[in-house]
Amino acid sequence: MDKKVTEVVEAFAQPIVEELNLELVDVEYVKEGQDWFLRVFIDSEKGVDIEECGAVSERLSEALDKEDPIPHLYFLDVSSPGAERPLKKEKDFQQAVGKQVAIKTYEPIDGEKMFEGKLLSYDGTTITLLLTIKTRKKEIQISMDKVANARLAVTF
């Protein structure tokens, strides 16, 4: 992923999204096969609909076409982050307390790099998870500097 492109797009997208009373969740810029994709994820407390995605897409496309900050041809996709929304900002973790989450760490902790459980707490530097391993429960703490990525987890 090209970090510079995502930062530039975030700067263009943030005021557009805020003007529409939405939240900018994430921006991805990835190459799949021969094609580049610019994915912008938006949300709100009530969720987002196709009209809101279309409005952001139209305004963002106009702004990007005018300034032309991206060196490649690309497909722009604006959508909701879905049920397994990524947790990136402090606010995301705070809102996820009490919910099921999936955490991937940079380094193994007790021999594991993937954890799924209930997020019990988040204090800005550490998360506490309640894991269910077969029939027993175990609390673990993970320092945020060890978290490679985190997302909400859907359970059935």
Curated annotation (Swiss-Prot):
One record GO biological process: translation
- Main localization of the protein described in the UniProt heading: cytoplasm
Keywords for this protein: Cytoplasm, Ribosome biogenesis
Q: Which Pfam families match?
A: DUF150_C (PF17384), RimP_N (PF02576)
Domain of life here?
Answer: Bacteria
**Cellular component terms, GO, for this chain's entry?**
cytosol
Per the record, the similarity remark reads: Belongs to the RimP family.
**What is known about what this protein does?**
Required for maturation of 30S ribosomal subunits.
- Name of this protein: Ribosome maturation factor RimP
